[in-house]
Each structure stands twice: as structure tokens, then as C-alpha cells.
């Protein structure tokens, strides 16, 4: 069984001086925080202190396949992004484990698809109830492995659980059709049937919600799943597995195979090319999505892709400045700018530009506090790793070298290598990296524009189209712009648009299909036409 590296006999000696703040001790079935405060500067302590008192059953480190917790031949470390300290060692699954998980899921599918919609609904509801009962522990796991501020982590757990609740209800609403044909002696039926085993590959920025948004729909439809969570945040996926087991979800219906970054490519390829897999659902970068699409093409598998974005945030002269700033703060700085629907470029009309920039800068200075995600008052945690920080830093330096002005922020934060100051740039032009590369960090570049047509042209120039936002008090303009923006989701005078009841997805290279809402379950259902003759 994989254990916390701090207390593995050889690991403690090797890593003790490198990660002095991590003080977890192993207990059968998971990791348990050691007693006593973690040493070191308060702002850089390992998140182990925030895990004190956590249910040992939720801190799993092995893979979950066929209803059993299984070790792998190797393990990999999961790190606290705030300090770099290791939280624990997790099973590093390879191709062999991936194929075993697919087979377990396929065997379970042969039984699960026969389970009544009412029973599937009941089991999903039990899973939801367990998430709500354990919401505090689940939130702390998210903060520990991703750095997300605890308040936001609590919000994610509720959002995550609501997908299970929603799809528990949708499970009983999978209806077919009866079609009357021109021939009097025939009747046509349209059945909706589960597609089969779904390979689910999820990101680190929402390590719980991105799983339940996919898995809730899949299980409601009668599919089974193999989840490959992001290597940075496997603990959330494994905690969900424990709760699924407690809820009575049958063995093999929900499987989790964590793996290291080194093994991620081959494991992803293995589950996406396995002939027993019928469906692939992926949330992540457009680059990786294209690779998975290539794998799916060889066997023509059904695919759902939620990929990168370059969300424009447009502020027209008629906008209410205070409302626009509030929306900008919510859209840009949630999860320290690490969301796929995060505003990436701010297009502000000339007449309101100066007032907006001034108010935006003041709001950032007043309301944003960088720190450890477990500390009360923190609104901006660390970025997931130093590579993410380097990307933000590169974009800022590129913009400044080409004439942009730093209004506030602009550099790494003194707290540590994975922290970056919330940054506002003005005098930004379209030749700068930050206007055509997804940042995934706390950088807000402002471009000044003159006409509505100019703003639409800039926004639609991107080859991706996930989300877009704009602020206006002109009713005619609102209709025009909402219809003309080439994105899958539009926020009109609103910076937070995600909801379990509404379809989530993009156009162009931002993906295929929709998740959540009444449409989400259709991604896991096949239509079958049955013709009855001789009547």
C-alpha cells in the first residue's frame, strides 16, 4: 500500500530536511495527519496542518479498481503547491493497471446497464448525501493538493455534489419516442441506451467537480467509468471513490487509476484506445485534447471535450462601472485565475476605459489577499506549480517589453515560488502573448477599443470559443453582441455563469459536446431505432 513519504522508513531520512512541514502518518487505508503544529514559517507550512482530524477513510493512496483498493508497482509524490512539501505517495498506475480497470468497468457495465433507472437514481442520491455529510473534509483535501482557498474549495464541493443530485434526478427522465410511420402496419420506436465504458480524464483545477459532472451523467445513463485524475490532485478522486463505495455503487462501476506525469501519456492512450471503451470524456488543454481525439479516431469512439478558452470580457461605454468591476473580479480571480472560463483579455471601450481601470485596480488592492489556502481571508492561493508561474511571468514581461503598463502587481510574490501577484496591465495590444495565449493565472490585460464592431472582431479572432462576457445597458446591443460572440457560453452583465442546470461547453477548438444540464446525459446515451412490422 502506498503511504505518506514522510514516514516511509527510507523516505523520512531522504526527505526529512527537504520537506520539514509535512507531518502525515500512515494508517490502514489512508494518510492521517500527525499531531502537533507543523514547523516553519506560518505562510509556508505544509498543508498537513489543515488536514488534522480528517477521516482516515477519505485519504486514500491506492488505485480503486473493481471495488478494491489496489497498490501499483511504483508510487509518485503529490505536493503541496504552497510550499512544495510532499503530502503523500500515491499508486503510480501504468498500462497494465489501466487495462485491468477497463475490464473491470466492462464487466460491471454488463450488470449496471440492467439496473433500473430508479435504483441508479437512488444510489447517486446516496453518493450525493455522503458528499454533503463529508463536505468539510473533502474541501480540505482540495485545498491541500491544489492550493485553492478553503472558501472556494467548499464552494467546489457543493457544486460537485449538486451534479450527483442533478443526475440522480435526470436518470429517471431518459425517455424514448414512438414514431408513426407512413406504413399502416408498422410502428417505430426510438430507444436510448447506455453507450458502455467511459474513459474520464480530468484536470487539477477542479479536482472534484470535473469528475462528478462527467461521472454523474455517465452513471445515470447506465455507463461505467474509469477515471484518470490529474497527477497533481489524485486525492479528491480517490476520496470520491471511497464515498461511492460507501453509497453502495456496485464494484467496477466507478474506477480510479492515478498516475504520475511520467506515465500519464501512456495511460491516457491505453484507456482511449482500448476496444472495450466506448466513450471518452476529457477536460484539459486543447493540445492534449487533439491527441486524445487522434486516439479516439482509430476506433471511432464517442468523444466529449472541454478544452481551453481565451474568454473576452468586454465593457461597453453604457456599462455600469461598479457592476463591471465586480464581474471582472469574480471572473478573473476565482481560483487565482486558473479556470477554463476565466476572463483572459479585457476589452474596454474608450469612453469608460480610464474609470474602469482605476476602479478595477482599487478593487484588486482592496479585496485580493495572497496566502496559504487554509488561512482565513486568503482569496488568492498559489498557482499549481512553478511552470504555471513562469507562464504568467513570461506573458507579463512580453507585454511590458512591447509597451504595456503595469497598473498593479507584475511580479512573483514573496511567499514562494508558486505565488504570483494579482496583476493588471493597461496599454495592451494584440501582438502581446497575453492576448492570444490562455494565461491560467492572475493576470488581467486591458485593451482599449473604439467601436462595437472592433470589440467583436478582436473577441472572435481566437481559434477557441468557450466563454465570453460583456457589460452593457443597451438592450439592442445586448442582443447583437450575445448572438455574435463565437463562444459556447455568454455572461451578460454577469461574471459567474457556471450552473449544474445549464449546458457547459464551447465551440471552435474549445471542445465538443456539453456537460451538465438536461443535455449532459445525452453524451452517454446511444439512440436505437426499432421498427415493428406486421401489425
From Swiss-Prot:
The modification Phosphoserine is found at residue 499. GO terms for cellular component: mitochondrion. Disulfide bonds join 340-342. Keywords: Acetylation, Disulfide bond, Mitochondrion, NAD, Oxidoreductase, Phosphoprotein, Transit peptide. It is an enzyme of class 1 (oxidoreductase). It comes from the Eukaryota. Pathway: Amino-acid degradation; 4-aminobutanoate degradation. Homotetramer. This is Succinate-semialdehyde dehydrogenase, mitochondrial. It comes from Pan troglodytes.
Amino acid at each position: 500500500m502506498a503511504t505518506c513519504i514522510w514516514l516511509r522508513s527510507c523516505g523520512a531520512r531522504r526527505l526529512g530536511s527537504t520537506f520539514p512541514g509535512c507531518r502525515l502518518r500512515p494508517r490502514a487505508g489512508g494518510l492521517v495527519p500527525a499531531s502537533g503544529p507543523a514547523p516553519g514559517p506560518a505562510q509556508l507550512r505544509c498543508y498537513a496542518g489543515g488536514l488534522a482530524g480528517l477521516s482516515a477513510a477519505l485519504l486514500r493512496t491506492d488505485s480503486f479498481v473493481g471495488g478494491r483498493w489496489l497498490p501499483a508497482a511504483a508510487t509518485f509524490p503529490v505536493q503541496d503547491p504552497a510550499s512544495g512539501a510532499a503530502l503523500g505517495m500515491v499508486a503510480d498506475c501504468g498500462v497494465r493497471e489501466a487495462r485491468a480497470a477497463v475490464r473491470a468497468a466492462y464487466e460491471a457495465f454488463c450488470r449496471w446497464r440492467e439496473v433500473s433507472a430508479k435504483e441508479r437514481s437512488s444510489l447517486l442520491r446516496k453518493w450525493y448525501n455522503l458528499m454533503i455529510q463529508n463536505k468539510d473534509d473533502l474541501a480540505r483535501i482540495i485545498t491541500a493538493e491544489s492550493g485553492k482557498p478553503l472558501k472556494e474549495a467548499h464552494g467546489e464541493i457543493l457544486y460537485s455534489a449538486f451534479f450527483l443530485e442533478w443526475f440522480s434526478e435526470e436518470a429517471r427522465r431518459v425517455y424514448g419516442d414512438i414514431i408513426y410511420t407512413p406504413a399502416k402496419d408498422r410502428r417505430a420506436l426510438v430507444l436510448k441506451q447506455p453507450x458502455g465504458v467511459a474513459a474520464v480524464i480530468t484536470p487539477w483545477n477542479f479536482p472534484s467537480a470535473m469528475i462528478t459532472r462527467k461521472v454523474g451523467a455517465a452513471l445515470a445513463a447506465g455507463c461505467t467509468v474509469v477515471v484518470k485524475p490529474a497527477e497533481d490532485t489524485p486525492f479528491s478522486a480517490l476520496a470520491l471513490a471511497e464515498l461511492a463505495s460507501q453509497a453502495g455503487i456496485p464494484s467496477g462501476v466507478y474506477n480510479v487509476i492515478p498516475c504520475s506525469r511520467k506515465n500519464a501519456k501512456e495511460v491516457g492512450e491505453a484507456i482511449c484506445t482500448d476496444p472495450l471503451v466506448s466513450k471518452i470524456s476529457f477536460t484539459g488543454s486543447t493540445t492534449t485534447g487533439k491527441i486524445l481525439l487522434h486516439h479516439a479516431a482509430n476506433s471511432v469512439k464517442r468523444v466529449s471535450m472541454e478544452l481551453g478558452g481565451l474568454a473576452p470580457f468586454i465593457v461597453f461605454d453604457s456599462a455600469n462601472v461598479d457592476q463591471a468591476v465586480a464581474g471582472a473580479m469574480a471572473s478573473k480571480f476565482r481560483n487565482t485565475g486558473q479556470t477554463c472560463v476565466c476572463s483572459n483579455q479585457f476589452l474596454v471601450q474608450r469612453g469608460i476605459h480610464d474609470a474602469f481601470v482605476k476602479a478595477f485596480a482599487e478593487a484588486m488592492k482592496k479585496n485580493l489577499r495572497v496566502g496559504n489556502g487554509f488561512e482565513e481571508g486568503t482569496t488568492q492561493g498559489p498557482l499549481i506549480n512553478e511552470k504555471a508561474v513562469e507562464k504568467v511571468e513570461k506573458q507579463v514581461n512580453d507585454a511590458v517589453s512591447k509597451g504595456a503598463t503595469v497598473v498593479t502587481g507584475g511580479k512573483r510574490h514573496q511567499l514562494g515560488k508558486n505565488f504570483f501577484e494579482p496583476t493588471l496591465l493597461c496599454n495592451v495590444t494584440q501582438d502581446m502573448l497575453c492576448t492570444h495565449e490562455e494565461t491560467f493565472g492572475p493576470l488581467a490585460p486591458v485593451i482599449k477599443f473604439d467601436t462595437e464592431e472592433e470589440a467583436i472582431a478582436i473577441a472572435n479572432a481566437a481559434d477557441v470559443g468557450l466563454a465570453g462576457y460583456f457589460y452593457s445597458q443597451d438592450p439592442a446591443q445586448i442582443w447583437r453582441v450575445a448572438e455574435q460572440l463565437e463562444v459556447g457560453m455568454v455572461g451578460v452583465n454577469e461574471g459567474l455563469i457556471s450552473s449544474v442546470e445549464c449546458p457547459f461547453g464551447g465551440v471552435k477548438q474549445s471542445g465538443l459536446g456539453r456537460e451538465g444540464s438536461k443535455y449532459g446525459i445525452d453524451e452517454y446515451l446511444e439512440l436505437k431505432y426499432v421498427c415493428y412490422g406486421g401489425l
